[in-house]
């Protein structure tokens, strides 16, 4: 870790943050609901990104005048090679600048489209605020404004012409170094350098620029996560410290710099007036410490031995949920949230806002207050879902499903249906030829028994291909089918009434839908 070389004030931030982290402890619990083949993991705390903080980072460059040395000294050759790399990087950035999201040149964008499109579709709206700042820097005079603000200091708040104030930082001054330290030595000392340190120092300073250039170049001007070349750990901590957020939010961010990096963007902006400027867009966690829980769901099917005659339903509301201002923020793509011990970092851009009644779906899927989401099918394929503290196992047909301990081998064989096993003493779950490793997190699991709700449905009238449905929609379809059956019963009855024997009702008249 890079903690040792930080400035004193950053160290104290980190230490307090660390103690804070251990104090919060981890009380993850899990409930498995047999009736709906789902499980909820509770005890997490939120860190929801609700906004962006943009900051401008600058590197001062030197327009190198021709270097007069043509000597054969090995060290001078190294310096010349390094200066060539430097010049190539600057040229590369200038070319790149003409095709980054900040430039408004239409014609040029057409031919850059291929290079960019696939990427920007993914993060287009995500980087809107960073791109906006980046565009302002292209206006006449903006770069000079920043440059002069950073003349005598490495950090300054600059008010841009669109009225937005941004914190600007100068992280590397290659101009000063090349013009005042490097070139005078090379030119003065009859083209030979006595100490190799000069070469090494330049290589190190230059390396950062080369890496930044490479990253921007490979990623068409927008990178995420933000690497340590774009922003070192101490620079990032110092930025966090200057952000307009509460101390709790600062602690949270300083304590999780890796996740902050993953949720941040670096956007190439401009290179002119001997300055390279890029925008770093950091997450603002406006909601922290509210409860979060994760819902895991797996297919629940009937278990008739006759192949192809089974019906299945699966809850489709799996994902992360966090309390947020009286409602619930729901993150359907669980993998977009990053979990660090019991802390869940999610982005509200990927969320839906739901009423808090959505929780009723866990305890009573037929509740009248919230229409719970399900999908239906006839494919009783076996599978397993690894939860925070165990595994849900959907075992159907002739598949072999087992749970094993690494020392004792198989310790449980699952029969057909949906079941759950906690991670106590269990290391792996195997379903057919797929092996799953369970999470080794500590916590209490609760197995809530209940009649599997799929057994309440009549296979004859079950709508078995509803991809995106709800309990009430499925019931509606069933009622339509039942009405249809009643109607055909009547028709048959009328036809048969003319004959001597009446048919006592046809297929389905004896079947009725059981309600909870």
Each model region followed by its residue ranges:
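Aromatic-enriched hydrophobic runs in primary sequence
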Residues: 4-6, 131-134, 138
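Membrane-active amphipathic alpha-helices enriched in small hydrophobic residues
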Residues: 120-133
């Amino acid at each position: 870790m890079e903690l040792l070389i930080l400035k004193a004030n950053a160290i104290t931030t980190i230490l307090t943050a660390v103690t804070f982290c251990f104090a919060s402890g981890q009380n993850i619990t899990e409930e498995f609901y047999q009736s709906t083949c789902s499980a909820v993991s509770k005890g997490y705390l939120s860190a929801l990104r609700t906004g962006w903080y943009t900051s401008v980072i600058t590197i001062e460059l030197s327009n190198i005048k021709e270097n007069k040395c043509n000597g054969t000294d090995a060290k001078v050759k190294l310096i010349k090679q390094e200066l060539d790399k430097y010049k190539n990087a600057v040229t590369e950035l200038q070319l790149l600048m003409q095709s980054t999201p900040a430039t408004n040149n239409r014609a040029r964008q057409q031919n850059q489209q291929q290079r960019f499109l696939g990427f920007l579709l993914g993060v287009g709206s995500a980087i809107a605020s960073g791109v906006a700042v980046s565009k302002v820097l292209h206006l006449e005079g903006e770069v000079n404004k920043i440059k002069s603000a950073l003349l005598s200091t490495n950090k300054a708040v600059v008010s841009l012409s669109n009225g937005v104030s941004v914190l600007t930082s100068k992280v590397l001054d290659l101009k000063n170094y090349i013009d005042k330290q490097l070139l005078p030595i090379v030119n003065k000392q009859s083209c030979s350098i006595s100490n190799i340190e000069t070469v090494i120092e330049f290589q190190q300073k230059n390396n950062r620029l080369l890496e930044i250039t490479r990253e921007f170049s490979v990623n068409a001007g927008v990178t995420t996560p933000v690497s340590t070349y774009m922003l070192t750990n101490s620079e990032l901590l110092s930025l966090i410290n200057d952000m307009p957020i509460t101390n709790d939010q600062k602690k949270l961010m300083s304590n999780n710099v890796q996740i902050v990096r993953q949720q941040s963007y670096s956007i190439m902006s401009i290179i002119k007036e001997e300055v390279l400027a890029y925008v770093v867009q950091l997450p603002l966690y406006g909601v922290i410490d509210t409860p979060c829980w994760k819902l895991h769901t797996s297919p629940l099917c009937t278990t008739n031995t006759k192949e192809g005659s089974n019906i299945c339903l699966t809850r489709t509301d799996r994902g992360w949920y966090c309390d947020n201002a009286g409602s619930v923020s729901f993150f359907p793509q669980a993998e977009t949230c990053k979990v660090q011990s019991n802390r869940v970092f999610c982005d509200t851009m990927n969320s839906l806002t739901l009423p808090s009644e959505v929780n009723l779906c866990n305890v009573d899927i037929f509740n009248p207050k919230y229409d719970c989401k399900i999908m239906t099918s006839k494919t009783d394929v076996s599978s397993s879902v690894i939860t925070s503290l165990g595994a849900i196992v959907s075992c159907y047909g002739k598949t072999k499903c087992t749970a094993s301990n690494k020392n004792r081998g198989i310790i449980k064989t699952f029969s057909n249906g949906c079941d759950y096993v906690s991670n106590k003493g269990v290391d792996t779950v195997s379903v057919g030829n797929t092996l799953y490793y369970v999470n080794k997190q500590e916590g209490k699991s609760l197995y809530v028994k209940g009649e599997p709700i799929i057994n309440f449905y009549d296979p004859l009238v079950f709508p078995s291909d509803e991809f995106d449905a709800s309990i009430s929609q499925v019931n509606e379809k069933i009622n339509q089918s039942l009405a249809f059956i009643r109607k055909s019963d009547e028709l048959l009855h009328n036809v048969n009434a003319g004959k001597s024997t009446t048919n006592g009702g046809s297929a389905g008249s004896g079947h009725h839908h059981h309600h909870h």
